[in-house]
Amino acid sequence: MDIDDILREVDPTFHSIPQEKRDLQELTRAWIAERSAPELLAWPADGLFERINDNIKQQIEKVEEMTGDMDPKTNFALIVIQTELERYRYLVRSYLRARIAKIDRHTLHYLSTDDLRARLSEMELAYATRHQALLHNHYLSSFLSSFPANLQNLNDAAAGISMIETPDLESAVFIRALKDTPVEARGVDTDAYADLKESDIVILRWADAKKLVEAGTAELV
């Protein structure tokens, strides 16, 4: 289920909203989710960022055209467009920075399997691959070259213990129910079960909340 299907169920009028406004809503949701989740979420695969980038380019062109017109009647419209443009830019920059920070922190983890690599965009994958290569070369020139060859790998799993650092999936997140749904939460001493109503907000371990978010029955807040 993609975000359009989720939003259509939650708000039947969603597709009557202009595409530009829907894209802004989806971008905002993606930004909030990425900043809230302890691990990297999947890159939007519905062409969202291509449309966002096209819209930003169009707004920049419009601002450039209107800047040459000093008619006081157009000044207010120019301010509105510039404000909207800055909002788009802020959301995109903040979203990408949140993702890059996660990639930098756990590069080997996100390069370790095809499923994890699929979460990255093409540019992010190229960045992560190059970043890890540079880091490994730096370690080799600094100290790893003095180690035996079998101890120079950064992804060693000797004795069944992996050297790859992974995100903390047990960290807490806030989620909002998008529909009535049952919730199972694992505790230290016992597990808990609850029935969430639409719009209810609860705090859960990400490991428990993840399946609800991926199924589209809840969103990160």
Curated annotation (Swiss-Prot):
The keyword Nucleus applies. GO terms for cellular component: GINS complex. GO terms for biological process: chromosome segregation; DNA-templated DNA replication; double-strand break repair via break-induced replication. Keywords: Chromosome partition, DNA replication, Nucleus. Transmembrane segments: none annotated. It is found in: Nucleus. CDD domains: GINS_A_Sld5, GINS_B_Sld5. It comes from the Eukaryota. PANTHER family: DNA REPLICATION COMPLEX GINS PROTEIN SLD5, SLD5 PROTEIN. The GINS complex plays an essential role in the initiation of DNA replication. Has a role in chromosome segregation. This is DNA replication complex GINS protein SLD5. It comes from Chaetomium globosum (strain ATCC 6205 / CBS 148.51 / DSM 1962 / NBRC 6347 / NRRL 1970) (Soil fungus). The gene is SLD5.
